[in-house]
Amino acid sequence: MELTVATILVTFAGVFLICFMKGAFGGGFSIVGIPLLSMVMDPVTAGGLLAPLFIAMDLFALRYWKPSTWSKPDLFALLPGLVTGIGFGYLLFRFLDHRAIAIAMAAITLIFVALWLIAGAEVTTRPRSTPKAITAGIASGVTTMVAHSGGPPLAMYLLPLGLSKDVYAGTTSLFFTVGNATKAVPWLLLVKPTGNVWTLMALCVLAIPAGVWAGWRLHGSLDQRQIYRLCYGLLVVTALKLLWDGVSGYLV
């Protein structure tokens, strides 16, 4: 990959947007910033670039999403599935049909949002389910490994619980801190970034503090209902991006 001014600026903007999402919603919507990166690099290179950056973003975000914002009962059920899913994703990375996974995840996500809209588009409160949490963790682990999009399975489990906006964001933040730290080494083994990618990575670290802080300020200015509606809206954006990636992959 050639390191040009355009590459640096576009990548910096993409990383800033991802950090903004982590500050505002805790995690899970990183895919929103990936289209910017795809303008200047291929998806595999972007994956290698983001793997270490995600760790730095997550650790910085935990300055805002402290232990008091973590839903520990949910994390206790979710995290083992997450690590297991990442393991499956790594072992099957070269054999899985990433396009089919993207399309299936997009369809499931759009159905989930459609059902929420039909039900009145309000914050709900449903009981916890350990089997659902484990399933969501595994699905998130696989999709975050193969498509950097582990957000939808987690959101489909957490949003119906009606957690407070801070607890929702804090729980997703810690969830993806663990997930991104777990998948960093497998991704670097698969991709092996070049010198230019490491240089670009170092430059993009500068976007992290401002991006996370700006997102956190937005989070503080919105109420529970607004945050949840934005999360559902971002799920639609994420699903459409996954659908495009999957369908266009078959057309190439």
Regions found by a protein language model. Give the residues of each.
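Transmembrane helix exit motif
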Residues: D58-S68, A104-S129, W216-R217, A239-V252
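Signature of the 12-TM Major Facilitator Superfamily
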Residues: T45-P52, A77, I103, G170-L174, ...
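Juxtamembrane helix-boundary/capping and inter-helix hinge elements in multi-pass membrane proteins
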Residues: M39-V44, R63-K72, L159-V167, V191-T194
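Structural signature of hydrophobic alpha-helical transmembrane segments
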Residues: T7-I8, A13, L37-I55, R99-T109, ...
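Selective hydrophobic functional segments
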Residues: L49-H98, A181-R225
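Selected transmembrane alpha-helices and immediately adjacent juxtamembrane segments
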Residues: M1-V40, E122-T172
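Hydrophobic alpha-helical transmembrane segments in multi-pass integral membrane proteins
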Residues: A46, G87-F93, V142-S149, K183-P186, ...
